[in-house]
Design a protein with these regions (language model features):
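Short, glycine/acidic-rich beta->alpha junctions
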Residues: 80-81, 115-120
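Metal-dependent nuclease catalytic cores that hydrolyze phosphodiester bonds in DNA/RNA
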Residues: 1-98, 105
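Hydrophobic/aromatic-lined pockets within catalytic cores
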Residues: 32, 36, 103, 128-131, ...
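Non-catalytic, well-ordered alpha-helical scaffold segments
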Residues: 21-25, 121-124, 187
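A structural motif
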Residues: 93-101, 161-168
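Short beta-strand-loop-alpha-helix junction that forms the active-site gateway
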Residues: 101-114
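Phosphate-binding glycine-rich loops and adjacent basic patches that engage nucleotide phosphates
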Residues: 84-91, 121-134
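Metal-dependent nuclease catalytic regions and adjoining charged, substrate-binding loops involved
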Residues: 111-116, 125, 129-210
Length: 210
């Protein structure tokens, strides 16, 4: 969405972490596709088919291809111009759930009691864009492969705030100005952002207020 030069901050540890996360995604999603075969009452729903059947305002940029090991579906919303990768959609009875898979360290996994705050905005985004109320987070311990699941259903207030924030960011892009960093952002907030160097370059200049 944002058209600006970015810095490649890849490191061996980051690459290794990403590769481990990819393996976990593939492992979990390969099992998800076989749930009915394994006697599990949950149903795996093809994301692209769901988009087409429900006439959602989404462009399918890339469909999943299980034979090639590509389990995510790449989508773009035609109204908000937001691109995202959907891990999957599940159905239980008459209710649909967005599936979001997260790999996590053993230490973080042990402490996990609910959906972390840092993932809630993503849950709101996917809920709005796909028109599905509840996101089912599946956390996988990347060391021991233990799993925990948590449901998160965004409120109407969260969805309204998300839309306002997106309108603000879109306006910043159109005006080619740097948005304010959130007040509650900690030192890790920008750690893996590809646009960190761009923001640092203009940090002393006037930023665009909401």
């Amino acid at each position: 969405m944002v058209q600006a030069p970015y810095t490649d901050s890849s490191s061996y540890s980051l690459i290794g972490s990403c590769e481990g996360g990819t393996f976990i995604h593939e492992m979990v999603q390969s099992k998800v596709t076989r749930m009915e075969e394994l006697g599990i009452k949950w149903q795996d729903v093809n994301v692209a088919d769901y988009v087409r059947e429900n006439n959602l305002n989404l462009e399918i940029l890339k469909e999943c291809n299980f034979e090639k090991g590509e389990y995510e579906t790449k989508l773009q919303h035609n109204g908000y111009k937001v691109r995202f990768l959907a891990d999957g959609i599940l159905k239980y009875g008459d209710k649909y759930f967005i599936l979001e898979i997260k790999s996590i360290s053993s230490n973080g996994f042990f402490k996990l009691k609910e959906v972390p705050e840092k993932y809630k905005t993503q849950a709101v985004s996917y809920s709005v864009l796909l028109g599905i109320d509840t996101v089912l987070f599946l956390f996988v311990d990347r060391d021991l492969f233990n799993m925990k699941t948590f449901e998160y259903t965004p409120t109407a207030e969260e969805k309204a705030e998300w839309k306002l924030n997106l309108e603000y960011v879109t306006e910043c892009v159109e005006k080619r100005v740097v948005p304010n960093k959130p007040i509650n952002a900690d030192a890790k907030f920008c750690a893996y952002c590809n646009y960190k160097s761009v923001c640092n370059k203009y940090k002393d200049e006037e930023v665009y207020e909401k």
